[in-house]
């Protein structure tokens, strides 16, 4: 009788231990490995040859960009700062002295800046990266004690959208002399991505042996590098000394009217 009781007691403890192990394993979240193989370089070298220097100053306002939610704040700041830096280099390459203004609003220019600036260059726009709905699929993990992975996946192609507008102003009057806009959706940029996130449930036993991969951040950085190069290439073509000097007459007239 005692032996039988010992056997029942052992079996009960074994059952409890097994249940505890199962509960522990089920409570563990699967591991997600985020790749970091792409650097956010944002490189561009002016393509046009350096021309003769002029005794004229151009005011460069800080870019005013908005970004989609999937672009990290640090990427936003670097994109904005590199845009200002490279446009400054492009203008210097065209023979102009550049005064960088720590504001994106033309109304914040001081009187002395308005007076000494031949032109002002302002930039605004939206930098958007979104999954192509025609080429992106989502797969959610189903709850389950055994075979649920506990991972939701989105796999597809990241494409750009939004715009960048460059406006050339006469600083004293604040009047626009010219502008051009780049439609980012027209750029041939397509980045494959796999975004993996934890499901609302913890997953089953198999989830402890599953490792998810997420390369969506690398796809974003790669796309931003290409968007940046395309934007700079277009600005380099437009902001030439020949084009900028064509506003000479109108700029003088507008500045003269405000000085009277």
Swiss-Prot record:
Subcellular location(s) of the protein: Cell outer membrane
Lipidation (S-diacylglycerol cysteine): 28
Lineage: superkingdom: Bacteria
Main location: membrane
Coiled-coil boundaries: none
Range of residues in the leader sequence: 1-27
N-palmitoyl cysteine-type lipidated residues: 28
Keyword presence, Lipoprotein: yes
Cellular component aspect of the GO annotation: cell outer membrane
Protein name: Neuraminyllactose-binding hemagglutinin
Keyword Oxidoreductase applies: no
One Pfam family from the record: NLBH
Topology class, membrane: Lipid-anchor
The organism of origin for this protein: Helicobacter pylori (strain ATCC 700392 / 26695)
Key words, A-Z: Cell outer membrane, Lipoprotein, Membrane, Palmitate, Signal
Family annotation (SUPFAM superfamilies): XCC0632-like
InterPro entries in the cross-refs: NeuraminylLac-bd_hemagglutn (IPR007876), NeuraminylLac-bd_hemagglutn_sf (IPR038531)
